[in-house]
Structures are given as C-alpha cells and as structure tokens.
Amino acid sequence: MLKTNKVLFFDGIEFENIILHYIDHGKFNLAKKALSIGMDQHPKNIELMLLKTEILLFEGAFKDAEKLLVEIEILSPENEEIYVQRASIFSKKKKHKLAIALLYKALTVTENPSEINNLIGNEYLFIENFNKAKEYFIRCLNENHEDYQSLYNLLYCFEKLNQINEAKIFLKEFIDSDPYNEIAWHQLGKLYIKLNEYDKAMSAFDFSIISNESYSSAYIEKGKLLEKVDNYQEAIKNYQISFKLNSPNAFISHRIGLCHMKLGNSTLAMNFFEESIQLEPNHEQSWIDLINLLQRNNELLKSQLYVRRSLEVNGDSIELWRKSAEINFKIKFYHDVCTACEYIDSIGNHSLKTWKFWVDSMIYLKNWDSAHKIGLRASKSFPNNSSLLLRVAGCKIRLGKKKEGHNIIKETIKRKNITNQIRKKINAFFPELLNFNL
C-alpha cells in the first residue's frame, strides 16, 4: 500500500500494528506515512493519536505533541498514556516536579501501577530526592520481585543516602520472601564487602550461585573477593567458570592475568593481558599492566613497542603517555620523551616525575634554552623542589647567565634539603657546579 500509494481501508487496530511495526524497525518515514493514512480514515482514534504524539516527541516537536495530548485528554480523560506522555515532555524539559504531578494522575487511572511507580521513582532520582525515589522503587518490587531495574535503582538510593545497613536489612527481608533470588543474594554479597564482612559476602555469593548456577556475575564478584583475600588460585577458577558461561571479555582476561601476576606466573599473566587486549584493544589497564610487567622483567625495548601500540588505540590516555616518557627516558630515546611530555603538557596534567623527564631529556640533547624554559615552568608548579631549581641554575650558567645561576644555587643551598641523590645527579649534568659543594 505504502509503495504503490494505493489506499486500502483498515480498522484502527490494524493501522496501529502496522505503525508499531515500522517504529520498532526504525522506519519512521513509513510509520508517519501509515499514520497519516490511518488518521485520514480514523481521525479521532485515540490510539492512533497517541502514536502520533509519540512520533512528535521522538522528533522533538514538544509543543505540537502537547497540543495534541490536550485534545486527546478531552476525548478520553481516563487514558493513562496521556499523562505518561505529557510527563515525558516535562521531564525532557527538566520540569520534573510537573512530570511527577502528571504521573500521580496516571496512577489514579492505570491498571498497571508498577510501570507508573517506576516512572515516578526515576523522576525523583532526577531531582535527587532519594527518599521519595526509594519509596516508589519499593512499591515496584512489592508488586514484582523480578523488577531488577527497580532493585538496582533502590540500592543506588540507599547508597546515596549512606544507608548501607538499611539496604542490608531490606535485601535480607527481600530474600526471606524470595529465597532463590540470585540477584538479591549477589547484591547482598556486594554490601557485605562494603561492610568488610568478607565471610558473609562469600556465603552470599555461594547462595547466589546455588540459586542459579549459570549466573556469571556471582562468579565474577566471588573471584574479585577471593583476590582481595589473596586466594588467587580459587579466584582464577571462578573467573574461568564465568568465561564458560559468557562469551570471552577483556575484563575477565585482565583479572585472570592479574591473579597469575600475583602468583609469579609472568608468562601466563602476559598471555592473559594480551588476550584481554585482543578482545578489547582500548582496554587501557591491560596495556598498562602488560607494560609494567615487561618493565619489571627488564624488557625495555619490548615495553617501548607495546607503549607505541597502546597509544595507537588509546591516544588520550595520560597514564600511557607517562609510561611512554618513562620508558623512552630509560632507553635514552630523548626525542620521544619530549613528544610524550609535550602531549602531557598540552592537557595540563604534569607530575614532578614527567617535568624531570622533560628537562633532563633537553639537557641530554644539549638544548639548554628549552631545558631552561621547561625548568622554570616546572619550578612554578614545584617551587620548593631543590632538584628542579638546581637544573634551572645549571641551564642559566650554560646560557651565559652565570650570576643568575649562582644566586639560585646559593638560595637553594640555604634550604639544606639537597640529598646525596640530587647532588650526584646535578654534578653529572653540570660538573662546574662541583665548586659550590652542594
């Protein structure tokens, strides 16, 4: 009909089904065309009018939608969908209290209060009235124990209100009425961890697994808890079970890698970190832990290779750029150190360590002017750091500003905080400073 422009007569329900089919498949132009034909044949059909408001809302035409909803309310004042859609408009305009008032009206006419209670709870979340939100999510759960989104929202409210014990009491009562609810046991275990009650947490995760042996989240949380108590072998077993229940994912491979690293199994740890990266190339922490492991094994050239690869997919990772500066400094690739430090500088996220890498690289490259300028900037961020001040002094002397350099050295010596390590480093850079008996 829509392709040939041949108009056939359908009843309102048939048009509704056609329109919903197109909406569900994202074919909004066809949905609008079918709606137009349907409205021509059934101009006062409430369900078609409501579908029109839904499409108007999707397109952001709030005023037109609101106008149509007022018209529908006159025709069918007992229709809950009118109040729900009007509430949606106010919610999108961030007028959440007006949205709540309309949803209260919807409660008086609905045959499905659970859905409306959930919407009211979410509106209260928007205005951070967690006590009221909590009340409505509890209502949802009283009506439907499997409304897990309401359960998660309720626990979020308890958390924001710092009511961990109250959350624990609620979950225990919830479990009393539904003892094989794996989600509730899982959440109770997570609460026990926050309360440092690890034995009770372990039992809760075990009960979650007993309730549903294919519930992978319980194995994952149990694995994390076993890591926390240094039982890495058992943690690996639980992670491996979760692997079998779901498709492989980077998070689990990374956790198994960490366990092997703690057990001293460097090769296995590297294998799992690499597997994690293959599954999710931008999994930053897997790159970092793999690079750290290579550094600890003194495989610096290999770690540099991995840093380069990691930055190809995680180019905005400040931690990986810091790693790049550190590793390239160790292997004396000073130009690459400067590149890394320049990026770190561009986003204003320097540490004392990276400032020193940058200044020292410029010194090794004998670029005294740049080393001097960078050192001055670093000294503004760390004004009491003798190591930086002495680097600046040495650069000034190399640039022919001997008096300024000598003055900085004298002032720094007065502070009496020059360690043997600093003294050794500065004398290696600037042998002429030996005369000052730093």
What are these regions (language model features)?
Residues 41, 74-76, 109-110, 143-144, ...:
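Structural marker of alpha-solenoid helical repeat scaffolds
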Residues 13, 47, 81, 115, ...:
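Start-of-helix register in tetratricopeptide repeats
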Residues 38, 71-72, 105-106, 139-140, ...:
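Canonical positions in the second alpha-helix
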